[in-house]
């Protein structure tokens, strides 16, 4: 018997691209959403998680049975926990304690060990602790923030999928920026196909907090980030991102997280500035891992 998907790992990628139906954009523009929550562990991070582990294996840097360590705000941790379960690794994940209960529970459900740092220490503190644990010989850090296999996963899969699905007509790509792996890899691929494609990054405005993305201090800026691969950065208020997240669920039937709502909010803004554009925004995960945060409790 030949199976199309022999293992759960084979289900990663080739996610749907759908058209925005009801939220207001300029009528001459085509607004499209890449549904990365359809990946088996529920987010765009399934792609780099498998890439980082598989390519490290091919280089002989890690072997089944090793202990892997990673600092994460949520989605990468869940994806790595899944990948570690598939491939036989022990996974230690370090994250801020203000992350949603659902994300914490998903990691431990896959068998990962979870270490929490304080909200005040944040992702910077989580990253520092991961490095100290590696130095103490407690495991090997994959380091999504500096690991070239992170953007490479999007260069070889996400970018080509978007180009194929839009039949080469894409004019704008919009993505929230956390590790920046998605936007770096997709930008590289799309710009190789058409240098005119505009790459738009999203970050929280000063004083705003949007789960999964950061406004990094210079000393913690991901090493994989290359500023010249992004044409424009949009600062987004938490309130606007949350509002669009709720509207996506209630008006489009698309249940996603706040960073995805922020990406769509940025796309709606941009749509008012141009005509005859084909815009693609990344819907990086699903809304069920944010239910306990209360963002969906606000009235219509």
Label each PLM-derived region with a short phrase.
Residues 1-300:
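PLP-dependent amino-acid enzyme catalytic core
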